[in-house]
Amino acid sequence: MKCSVVKLLLTVIIPCSSLAQLQYPNTKKTDTIDNYHGTKVPDPYRWLEDDNSEETKAWVIAQNKATQQYLASIPYRQQVKRRLEELWNYPRYTSPFKEGDYYYYYKNDGLQNQSILYRQKGLKGVPEVFLDPNKLSEDGTASLAGLKFSLNGKYVAYSVSQSGSDWRVGYIIDVNTNTRLSDKLDWLKFTGFSWKGDEGFYYTRYPEPQTGEHLKGKNVLPQVYYHKVETPQSEDILVFEDKEHPQRFAGVGLTEDERFLLLSTSEGTSGGEIWYRDLKDSARTEFKLLIPGFKTEPRVVDNVGDKLLVVTNDGAANYKLVLVDPASPAAAHWKVIIPEKKEVLQSVSTGGGYLFAGYLKDASTKVYQYTYEGKLVREIKVPGIGTAEGFGGKKKDKEFFYMFTSFIYPPTIFRYDIETGKSELFRKSEAKFDPSLYETKQVFFKSKDGTKVPVFLNYRKGLKLDGNNPVLLYGYGGFNIPMTPGFSVSNAFFMEQGGIYAVVNLRGGSEYGEVWHKAGMLEKKQNVFDDFTGAAEYLIEEKYTSPAKMAIRGGSNGGLLVGAAMAQRPELFKVAIPQVGVMDMLRYHKFTIGYAWSVEFGSSEKKEQFDYLYKYSPLHNLKEGVQYPATIITTADHDDRVVPAHSFKFAARLQEVYKGENPVIIRIESKAGHGAGKPVTKQIEEAADIWSFTMYNLKMPFKDQSGNTQGKEKLKGF
């Protein structure tokens, strides 16, 4: 690919048609042109990729000012925010887990920015604060990103993220005294901690980025190190790096008995190899290959003596569990423990001397308990259609705690007796939401090519099929990630206001195994967009809603989905909410970890892949003279997963080709990232802005708890 840049700068004033009062900031254009395999592609907003430039910073300030002026004019914005604060304000807990003499759990009193880690001796003991992330920053933007206790519970290693960045800093706490040691580990990313006894642990880090590049520079050459407690990071021992393949990922883990050190490598977000070291053989320090090829998705569950339990889709698109002998690891020698089923094997964990296998049946959880020999003990019954997680623990455990949730069932914690199979309610949710007033319905429709695709519909009982119901259509469709039922305070608010929250299980996810995933990746990515627009058409045909009442939403890969859908079928939707989306499909691989997505998307550096990427890339398929939906684009200044340049350039182009009365605004959050670790204050503010924008443009009045409505008047000040 060749690139030519002409430094002539042009200034464009964006017309606002009949909504002349909403003045968009001027956005400079340059004569930047790329040549992709003979096709010349203009990139006039390339300068917005430089998030450190004063021009870009000024543009961000101007755009946020215009956005906030518009949002402040929505008559009921403050009422929406107050109601969201009321709904958010209830105690939330995670399932407890035991380490040493203590049970640990996270709790948020309601409006605390970050959940606090508590501990107590016994389930009826007195709780004490163990680690409070709210004390790590004044504004709640520092978050606890992960933690792991040492073998005997003497220490805990934890990592902290600042402003939602994927970069982490690691620390260690002495559990007995609850004091932080002097250890500090920098430049951690995409890693956990794998303890060896109480002496030290393995982790992955990256080389320190160049100045000014830590939020957008390409991350390559991951390095696996061993850190000994109470020593400086500079003395850590390098365990693995691959200079010949610097774009491969690398991570390590240990089996529960600490016999095997496992190294997982991958060339992207799909496909992997597994290497191992038998630590019982101290004379051997090199890794040996266990599962080769990068063509399958292997995951080691644990070991059984000198053999390893591995979940694999090798010859089993819906996955199976096999026992692998490292001495003869070829697939022909594997022993099948849990064979492939019609449903997708989503996870296998261990606990109390048993295996727990989690399956997806039409995107809902089924859980089974097995012996290590593969004999079925029982199905673990869960309350209904929804998502259950948290099964498993240590081999010595007699019980564990799991959580069940659905779209209309707030997270509820159950206590499970491993031997008897008895589940009992441990902690009921205190959410200000009455599930008896709502219902969930799963429907199926035929996509453009005849494929049957499921949709979850969630709404208040008494729904009338008159084509006038407001709908929020949500999807993701990629990276082998399923969209499973889960409760959200934000979505509960929309249902409370009379909306239908609809979730489509698009191809590209893992709802129906690897075949479903592959049907929505690379050159078949268009299937994902067809599934999404097909769901919209189905809801319109069945009189659930109409285009004037339809909003679409998605984040990250789902932001790409929304961008592509609104570009291809703008007439279907009234509101579009692309969040932290991948919008420039020709240059995404040039930033941070984006190159890893090429196994899913393809790369513009290859002619045949450029051709289909260019056809659907949201940035490159916005056309002059089209009335696009009312659009609120969201991103954040510390998003180093999908850099904000994607959203910046998409917003600039959409405002450039703007026609009609629908607003196009971009909300750029400060001191926030791709979404993880976002403080509750920022979550509520963002939800208030998005729902106010959505409801107003769908002509939904705000309903208070007394049944009074507000919002039929025009925008204040416009």
Task: Identify the function of each model-found stretch.
Residues R119-Q120, Y171-V175, K218-E230, W275-K280, ...:
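Beta-propeller blade signature
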Residues N134-S150, S159-S165, T179-S182, Y416-K422, ...:
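Cap/lid segment of the alpha/beta-hydrolase catalytic domain
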Residues V503-F718:
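Active-site-proximal cap/loop segments of hydrolase catalytic domains
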Residues E54-K148, S159, R248-N303, V336, ...:
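Non-catalytic accessory segments flanking enzyme active sites
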Residues M1-Q23, T709, E713-F718:
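Bacterial Sec-dependent N-terminal signal peptides
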Residues Y103, G153-A157, F201-Y202, L261, ...:
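Hydrophobic beta-strand positions that form the internal "hydrophobic ladder"
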Residues S161-Q162, R205-V220:
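Short, conserved, GDST-rich strand-edge loop motifs in beta-rich repeat architectures
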Residues P222, Y226-T265:
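Polar, glycine-rich mid-to-C-terminal structural blocks
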